[in-house]
Amino acid sequence: MSFQNSNSVLQLRLKSRAHSLVELVQTPNKSEYSELGFFRSPRQRLTSKAELPPLSVKPKANNCISKVKCSKKSYGMIKAFAVCTNQGLVRSYNEDRVTIIPRVKLNELEHRVSYFSLFDGHGGAGCADFLAENLHQNFFTNLKKETDITKSLKNSFSLAEKTFFTSQFKVNYDNSGSCALSCVIHAGNLYLANVGDSRALLGCRNRKCVYQLTTDHKPSNLREKNRIEKAGGKVIAGNGTGVSRIFPGKLSVTRAFGDFTAKIKSLGGNSEVLVAKPEIFIYPICAEYEYVLLASDGVFDVLENEEVNEIVWQVLDGPEKDMHEKAGNACKAVINLALKKSSSDNVTCIIVVLKDM
């Protein structure tokens, strides 16, 4: 995808709004949830049979309290899910966003679809906000036409990149960017679409194993480094403990939405270096799969996969009987451990429990 400069760009307006971190598209049962104080009318009705609980987290500036929300009931093979986010120890705002759609029945598909997405924004929250509001709409709209999960994920990512450019950069000069990690569960399969350095883990085999399901799109990834250099870009290694970065862009990720000054040729960019093309992973779900975890790089900058798995199981194996509360507490435990290890970034974690504990 190539981009053309829009007239003369005199300045770039970077957005850093502290919007709602968790965006759920919903057609909820109001009577069931209104007493929780979370109810909001949906922006758009995706289908006539959406089974979606309301869930939102609104951070306040300079508020380092971890925000946690969890499911209230099970959705087929999804026994529970939860999300926790924290702006971190250094940042005065949170650019992470989440969209969760627990289960939707589309007339075009035999099986219901569950959708979880994590967006790690940078340079302002504009791009992450845009993705949280639009990527799922692109996906479900395309899915009605294609009825193919993989194609719909790819098409939804491509359309989101194009529409963010035309509606935000060309109009508002919003040069913010965002990583994106989407997880779709459908017909016994787990689909992951990844752009950037957020990561998905799978816990399985009676707590004994944890597997990394996605690839981190970082300059240290040799395949990404080779791709960038072949496209005419450069990877500059950090000195000592410094972070390696790509040029043009001077970014520590090799794939991202937005960041159009790094992509527009007339502004010194290269559209083949920093790309928003997702890497797709497909896994058949088996009885040994126990949970899926999505987390932003602020978690994995300071924690190994095994540490995350261990802290998750310390909570899931605990005495609490309510699986939904367990999922929420597990998310919070991961975030708190990352903060204890002095993560300087925004930190967000989603856990989807696939097996009764």
Q: Where are the predicted features?
A:
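PP2C/PPM-type serine/threonine phosphatase catalytic domain
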Residues: 1-357
